[in-house]
Amino acid sequence: YTSFQNTSGKLFTKGYSLKSYTDALKFLDNAIPNTFFIAGTSLILIVLLSIMVAYLVVRRNNFVNKFIDTLSMIPYVIPGSVVGISLVLGFSKKPFVLVGTFSIMIVALVIRRNSYTIRSSVAILQQIPISMEEAAISLGSSKMKAFFAVTMPMMMNGIVSGALLSWISIITELSSGIILYNYRTTTLTIQIYTYVSRGSYGIAAAMATILSLMTALSLMGFMFFSKNKNVMF
């Protein structure tokens, strides 16, 4: 509603138009592509990490792997600002200088948002009997080939469900990004925060609407995928 209202400085005025959207689009040349690049790269790494952790926890169950499983949940309860500050302190000196790059944004998101996909991947793998892999191995497949050819397709329900939650939380992430970004790595949520702090509420509302639309389209895409591929949430 407010994204369509006319504005004058910090004040909303009478009348409605698309001016806030036209103004917002002028400042989103980098923010939207950056959002998709950072989120997409982070999600790929999260999915790969989740598959590995799920396999270790369920198929190679021991104290070390249980500790890894517990450790993967800790970032979920740590504030994003703490993660951001820790990464700045840890990667601001040689030989690993990542501050101000896309890499440090991606690392922060992988750390903060991997728990959704890990938990759902572990849960779905626990429901798949190991005897199916053993049958494939007895027919001549290696353990790795049996896992990826037999078990992985059956894990897709849990992987996709967790990945959706991770994706939505990634594209709406602010608390760690606001500490780690620079002018080259700004994202849509950071742009929204910037314009709110400047008092440009109309532009901020338009950007927030665009972000909400991106989230809704992600959910719709998941529903379409689940309908056609028999994926359950």
Predicted ranges, named:
Residues 27-39, 77, 86-117, 156-159:
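Loop-to-helix entry region at the N-terminal start of transmembrane alpha-helices
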Residues 1-4, 48-52, 85, 111-133, ...:
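Membrane-embedded alpha-helices of multi-pass transport/permease systems
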Residues 52-87:
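Cytoplasmic-entry segments and transmembrane alpha-helices of multi-pass inner-membrane transporters
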Residues 9-18, 64-65, 81-112, 144, ...:
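Membrane-interfacial helix termini and adjacent extracytoplasmic/periplasmic loops
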Residues 74, 78, 111, 118-121, ...:
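Transmembrane alpha-helices
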Residues 26-57, 67, 143:
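Transmembrane alpha-helix signature in integral membrane proteins
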Residues 3-10, 16-30, 171, 177-223, ...:
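Interhelical loop and adjacent transmembrane-helix boundary motif
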Residues 55-64, 122-132, 137, 141-149, ...:
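C-terminal transmembrane helix and the adjacent membrane-cytosol boundary/short C-terminal tail
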